[in-house]
Amino acid sequence: MLRGSMVALVTPMQADGSLDWEALHKLVDWHLQEGTDAIVAVGTTGESATLDVKEHIAVIRAVVDQVNGRVPVIAGTGANSTSEAIELTQAAKDGGVDACLLVAPYYNKPTQEGLFLHHQKIAASVAIPQLLYNVPGRTAVDMLPETIVRLSHVDNIVGVKEATGDIARVGQILESAKAGFLLISGDDDTAVDFIAAGGVGEISVTANVAPKLVAQMCELAAQGKVEEARAINARLADVHTAMFLESNPIPVKWALAKMGLMPNGIRLPLTPLDAKYHLQVEQALRAANLL
């Protein structure tokens, strides 16, 4: 079952941008030891936009092999071309993932009907559980609650990652969505309140550096121990902020390198974290006892 803390895993790279398979395997094992409930490979945080198709599928297969059935693996397979999204989703299914995460088409700004037809066609083409992903800050299009509700009744579409931070949407969607439709937060700051409102967990950037704390926070929120969950979230507040001082995953990759978990490699057009932010990220990690 998809629930709890689902890390939006980075894709480790060497300084020259080549993929670091050893670091990837170690990161996966660390997350399993720390209590992460599911792993999302090659999403936004995994730099899917700068991986070619061969690399994209290779990373998915590497994560699936390393996890070896211990927790669910979700693959980012969204694209702004419907046919490409179908191709990636089928390849991810063939690679053994448990579900796919499909970001709303970006840059070409489809209408709500276009969003519906895009996801409907992918769902009809590949028989695997699929999560919608609404992140208008990156895609320039907002998948409205009524569109999400329509899609909830389409076979193979099982949930949505909602990254607007708008808690009111949880109730709006759950009221009319198909029974059992999963609402997953895509915003670390508001995840506790999102879960308390009826969400099943979060896909987290902060979990890259604080897997145990984020897993505990999600579990407490799911148990209704909201104040205890909020206390953990307060401890992580500066980390949440630090992870977005520059475009994700720039800060989180620097943080993981600082923690000694991987090199600080990243691909253009993204660049390593500006030196002016190093101290702020380091202080946030230390304040949360992550360093």
Swiss-Prot record:
Enzyme class: lyase
SUPFAM superfamilies attached to this UniProt entry: Aldolase
Positions of the record's site feature: Part of a proton relay during catalysis: 44, 107
Binding site for pyruvate: 45, 203
Swiss-Prot/TrEMBL catalytic activity: L-aspartate 4-semialdehyde + pyruvate = (2S,4S)-4-hydroxy-2,3,4,5-tetrahydrodipicolinate + H2O + H(+)
Cited InterPro entries: Aldolase_TIM (IPR013785), DapA (IPR005263), DapA-like (IPR002220), Schiff_base-form_aldolases_AS (IPR020625), Schiff_base-form_aldolases_CS (IPR020624)
Compartments where found: Cytoplasm
GO MF annotation list: 4-hydroxy-tetrahydrodipicolinate synthase activity
Enzyme Commission number(s): 4.3.3.7
Chief location: cytoplasm
Active site: 133, 161
Pfam families, sorted: DHDPS
Biological process, per Gene Ontology: diaminopimelate biosynthetic process; lysine biosynthetic process via diaminopimelate
Pathway: Amino-acid biosynthesis; L-lysine biosynthesis via DAP pathway; (S)-tetrahydrodipicolinate from L-aspartate: step 3/4
Keywords: Amino-acid biosynthesis, Cytoplasm, Diaminopimelate biosynthesis, Lyase, Lysine biosynthesis, Schiff base
Oxidoreductase in keyword set: no
GO CC annotation, single: cytosol
Function as written in the Swiss-Prot or TrEMBL entry: Catalyzes the condensation of (S)-aspartate-beta-semialdehyde [(S)-ASA] and pyruvate to 4-hydroxy-tetrahydrodipicolinate (HTPA).
NCBIfam families reported in the protein's UniProt record: dapA (TIGR00674)
PANTHER family referenced in this protein's UniProt entry, alphabetically: 4-HYDROXY-2-OXOGLUTARATE ALDOLASE, MITOCHONDRIAL (PTHR12128:SF66), DIHYDRODIPICOLINATE SYNTHASE (PTHR12128)
HAMAP family in UniProt: DapA
Subunit structure: Homotetramer; dimer of dimers.
Similarity annotation: Belongs to the DapA family.
UniProt-recorded name of the protein: 4-hydroxy-tetrahydrodipicolinate synthase
Gene symbol of the encoding locus: dapA
